[in-house]
Design a protein with these regions (language model features):
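Conserved acidic carboxylate
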Residues: 10, 84
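Charged docking surfaces used in two-component/phosphorelay signaling
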Residues: 17-25
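Acidic, metal-coordinating helix/loop segments flanking the phosphotransfer/catalytic sites
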Residues: 32-50
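C-terminal output helix
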Residues: 38, 105-118, 122, 126-127
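Conserved phosphotransfer cores of two-component systems
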Residues: 44-46, 70-77, 95
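Active-site residues of response regulator receiver
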Residues: 54
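The feature encodes the CheY-like receiver
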Residues: 58
């Protein structure tokens, strides 16, 4: 069985691994990027169903990656979960993502994230449906 693909873009190796384990347990296959440049390279090669995106990254910012996702037709339907320790940035970007998690991220937030992602796994051939608001 093919799995939906999640791209985890988080420079904190421990948090990246926590996301990887949680998403794998929820049924996703995962790829990890630890900086913005690598994330952009992945997005040129793969089409994930979801991107877990830290805002503060080495080389290329999460905001730049978010703009790239929204401005590229082949990427615009990817679900995006923003992670940041900056509550003001989180509020500012709330309407540009499917979900915003403010760090530190609790177990409950992580559990709720995987529950919210379950519909992604149920879509035909794991195509991410268009965002509805």
């Amino acid at each position: 069985m093919n799995e939906a693909l999640a791209l985890i873009v988080e420079d904190d190796e421990d948090l990246n691994e926590v996301f990887r384990q949680a998403l794998a347990a929820a049924g996703f296959s995962t790829e990890s990027a630890y900086d913005g440049r690598t994330a952009l390279e992945f997005l040129e090669k793969i089409s994930p169903s979801i991107v877990i995106l830290d805002l503060h990254l080495p080389f290329v910012s999460g905001e730049t990656i978010l703009k790239k996702i929204h401005s590229t037709p082949s990427l615009e339907n990817i679900r995006v979960v923003i992670t940041t320790a900056d509550a003001a940035a989180a509020e500012f970007l709330r309407d540009q993502a499917d979900l915003v998690l403010v760090k530190p991220i609790s177990y409950i937030q992580l559990r709720d994230l995987t529950k919210r992602l379950n519909p992604v796994l149920q879509t035909d051939k794991f195509k991410t449906p268009p965002r509805t608001e």
